[in-house]
Amino acid sequence: MKTFSESHKTVFVVDHCPYMSESCRQHVEFDMLTKNRTQGIIPLAPISKSLWTCAVEASMEYCRIMYDIFPFRKLVNFIVSDSRSRTLNSWNREDQNLQELMAALAVIGPPNPRADPECCSILHGLVEAVESLCKITDFQHESRTALMGNADWVANRGRIICITNAKSDSHVQMLEDCVNETIHEHNKMAAGSDHLMQIQKCHLVLLHTYPVGEDSLVSDRPKKELSNVLVSEVHSVKAGRHLSTKLNQLVQLHFDLASTTITNIPMKPTLSVCDQEEQHANTSANYDVELLHHKEAHVDFIKSGEGYTGSSSIRENSLKETVTLKWCTPRTNSVELHYCTGAFRISPVDVNSRPSSCLTNFLLNGRSVLLEQPRKSGSKVISHMLSSHGGEIFLHVLSSSRSILEDPPSISEGCGGRVTDYRITDFGEFMRENRLMPFPEQSYQMDGGPEVPLERAKEQLERHTRYWPMIISQTTIFNMQAVVPLASVIVKESLSEEDLLNCQKTIYNLVDMERKNDPLPISTAGTRGKGPKRDEQYRIMWNELETLVRAHVSGSERHQRVMECLMACRSKPPEEEERKKRGRKREDKEEKGEKLNKDHEHDKKGQESERIKSVLDQEKEDLAEAEVIKDSPDSPEPPNKKPHIVIEDTGPAEKSKGPMSLLSLWSSRINTANSRKHQEFVGRLNSVNNKAELYQHLKEENGGEGVENGKASRQ
């Protein structure tokens, strides 16, 4: 069936009876000059609009927004009702514009307060509205012609918006009954006509408007289905700006519109004569403009998940949230912008305000405005752009994240491009076990009732996901092949005796692994050192296994027996605990021994480095003294001696047991160099500041005299 929604046809029925000429009692200041007033001049009194004027203005605003955003395929038929009904336009495309409607309303004029109210009724307009809905529009005629013999496949739906001043709830009910009966009568007439269409669905919206300050005689009522054809709802609204706000909310609901508020629009403020003397003319202020558009302009924005919740707010007198976007002046070329994923027509909410008109003229002159999401931190994100095409303004949606032309991201690509260890293989197996397929045979539950296959599939999916870690590093038991027999059957709705034995056997195997101190596949990612000790690893494993079994313990009696077996194996006997303590003490001793060996090696290396340093200093001193003796004229030439090699100092070369350290290489080099030198003189070894006293043994034997006589006799 070719579906035309209820928004395809909208019929406005406005009451033109004498009581609609009553004042709405909402005053409007007519004389706005409050400063520099000449003395003696009495200010003009405030004015107020009639109920008719408020109804016409609000309905025209509804039509303006609809025509701005949907210039095609959304049609309006305007009817006024007093002593008779008068249709101001038709469903033809040339009549679908505000100029035609306003010209027709000007001809009608305001209601006559002196007319006889008994002769006027809103029922004339409602009957005419039902008759208008039965007429075929150009779009419906094109669809019926294209379908040829299947013209009945084209649906006919519509909406009636009635603005009146009802007397009571019973009066409203009478209007609804009249519309319902009229629809059934006209459907019978349309069944035998080629120029009319039966109404499949009609949405009646009754707006009871009354002056400000009075009590409403009609109560609100949400949408209610009166028959298989008619759905009705009632709104009781004060006249004036309250009625305009209500119709603004309804147009958003009826046509799936969303609101976007553009903030920080730079614009010079409008100043009065007295204000211009106080404020410089070149100053500027930031203004806000609210725009309406189709809600699909926010779909990608909401999917991205960034900035939407923080940038949305509820405006005063507004039905829905409005998304706030900031005026942006980027320093980039238009070529560097992201791809445009959609363009939607816009309509300003307050079309007559100066900020709205300035923004509209700015865009119609060929300029574009980039809009960014307000963010507390980080770089700006340009998500939308305003631009005009062919005299119409569009809100363009820019791709603010990954381009739709790129390949989709990998399943293992997390936030910021970080690759995480998802259980991709296990998830593929999980999908195979829970895939949907046709269910050929009817099954029954335990109580005899039929079992719905979809509900059975949901229950199985719920059991399989009670405990299912998504990341490899967050689980131990799902990385162990020994736990697979238990993990694969514990998720069943009921266990057989064989399944119970397999689960118990798996638990006993884990106990045996713990007794043998076998290693477990514990992830040490992000940790320093060796990770948790062996008994700590098994404690983590047992806790996770208990979590898995406890999630399914209420499934059946055998599930409970698996849990009892697990708890019995976890409660170790005293000798087992004593063995564990001894094992922990042995591990602590081994760790302390390794630490002492490392400290001893470190001290040994320090002593070796000190010894090498002293030997190097001694070599430097020997070289300096040799240079002094050689340069002295009295010193004879030293005989050429073959270097004496001390064999006992050079032991057999040890075989390298691996890569040698720098200290070992340097020590080997120094030992080799020292072994090739002759034995040092005793006097030089015992010298002080490289000065050795000669004939010291004579002095010790004969005293100081012998030395002096010896010196004198030499002279």
UniProtKB/Swiss-Prot annotation:
Protein name: Integrator complex subunit 13
Domain comment, as recorded: The cleavage module binding motif (CMBM) mediates recruitment of transcription factors.
Family in the record: Belongs to the Integrator subunit 13 family.
Species: Xenopus laevis
Keyword field: Cell cycle, Cell division, Cytoplasm, Developmental protein, Mitosis, Nucleus
Pfam families noted in UniProt: Mat89Bb
Chief localisation class: nucleus
InterPro entries per record: Cell_cycle_regulator_Mat89Bb (IPR019355)
Function: Component of the integrator complex, a multiprotein complex that terminates RNA polymerase II (Pol II) transcription in the promoter-proximal region of genes.
Region listing for Cleavage module binding motif (CMBM), in residue ranges: 658-703
Stored PANTHER family: INTEGRATOR COMPLEX SUBUNIT 13 (PTHR12955:SF1), SARCOMA ANTIGEN NY-SAR-95-RELATED (PTHR12955)
Subcellular location: Nucleus; Cytoplasm
Assembly information from the UniProt record: Component of the Integrator complex, composed of core subunits INTS1, INTS2, INTS3, INTS4, INTS5, INTS6, INTS7, INTS8, INTS9/RC74, INTS10, INTS11/CPSF3L, INTS12, INTS13, INTS14 and INTS15. The core complex associates with protein phosphatase 2A subunits PPP2CA and PPP2R1A, to form the Integrator-PP2A (INTAC) complex. INTS13 is part of the tail subcomplex, composed of INTS10, INTS13, INTS14 and INTS15.
Entry's Gene Ontology cellular component terms: cytoplasm; INTAC complex; integrator complex; nucleus
Top-level lineage group: Eukaryota
Record region (Disordered): 572-612, 626-659
Residue span of motif Nuclear localization signal (NLS): 581-591
Gene Ontology annotations of biological process type: cell division; centrosome localization; flagellated sperm motility; regulation of fertilization; regulation of mitotic cell cycle; RNA polymerase II transcription initiation surveillance
